[in-house]
């Protein structure tokens, strides 16, 4: 007789998305570096969502390894995504105000792409998924902007400005992880004030004290290493 299990198996789930506009698809795909036939440099590469997710996952791994610079990057990323979400809502509210030009009695159905880009998404950090959700919000916003321009609710220049403002929110988030560099020093190195720590601080600058002590932290970061934080508190207390 088989032994009865008293625990459930691991939860499994899959995130799938549909992108309807070329603007959102461009933000997903980015652009590879282009080489000209004459050997000169062509267009520079542009980061897309897969590269962003890869870098965000690496930052999360470095945070798990107790690197305070990674914790600072996680906190910055969370703040940028939160701010971008608020700004996206403001853009949507502005578009809604423009759409009030349409008189009562006029019904406009939701625009649907004849063919969508269907994707399965995986991120090693919740912040990655939050950025994907922001991209989905931009895709829906872009659909409505294009529709408003088609029906003459907004002008061509307004369409250009609105789409540019929305896409810029995603690109600024991409840029925050593009600037990240692994430092390779941990809180234990800080507690010991060893050569690894001093070299890292010279190269990357000292991390924020509140982040170092775990007082400021992204809500989506791995748990802070309490043992190393306790050692750091003792070190700073002794140095007073």
Model-derived features: positions:
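Polar/charged low-complexity regulatory segments
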Residues: 1-134, 140, 147, 166-240
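Short, hydrophobic/aromatic alpha-helical segments in well-folded domains
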Residues: 144-145, 162
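Short, solvent-exposed positions on alpha-helices
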Residues: 157-158
């Amino acid at each position: 007789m088989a032994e009865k299990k008293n625990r459930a198996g691991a939860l499994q789930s899959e995130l799938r998305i549909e992108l309807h506009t070329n603007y959102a698809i461009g933000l997903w795909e980015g652009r590879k570096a282009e080489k000209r036939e004459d050997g000169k440099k062509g267009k520079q590469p542009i980061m897309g969502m897969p590269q962003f997710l890869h870098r965000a996952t690496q930052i999360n791994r470095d945070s798990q390894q107790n690197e305070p610079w990674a914790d600072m990057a996680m906190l910055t990323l969370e703040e940028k995504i939160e701010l971008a979400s608020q700004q996206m809502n403001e853009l949507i509210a502005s578009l809604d105000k423009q759409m009030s030009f349409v008189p009562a009695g006029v019904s406009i159905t939701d625009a649907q792409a004849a063919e969508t880009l269907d994707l399965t998404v995986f991120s090693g950090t919740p912040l990655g998924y939050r950025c994907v959700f922001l991209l989905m919000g931009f895709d829906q916003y872009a659909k409505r902007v294009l529709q408003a321009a088609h029906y003459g609710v907004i002008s061509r220049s307004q369409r250009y400005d609105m789409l540019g403002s929305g896409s810029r929110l995603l690109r600024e988030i991409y840029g925050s992880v593009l600037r990240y560099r692994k430092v390779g020093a941990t809180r234990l190195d800080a507690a010991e004030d060893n050569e690894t720590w001093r070299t890292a601080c010279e190269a990357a600058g000292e991390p924020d004290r509140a982040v170092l002590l775990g007082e400021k932290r992204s809500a989506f970061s791995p748990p802070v290493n309490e043992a190393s934080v306790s050692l750091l508190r003792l070190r700073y207390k002794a140095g007073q």
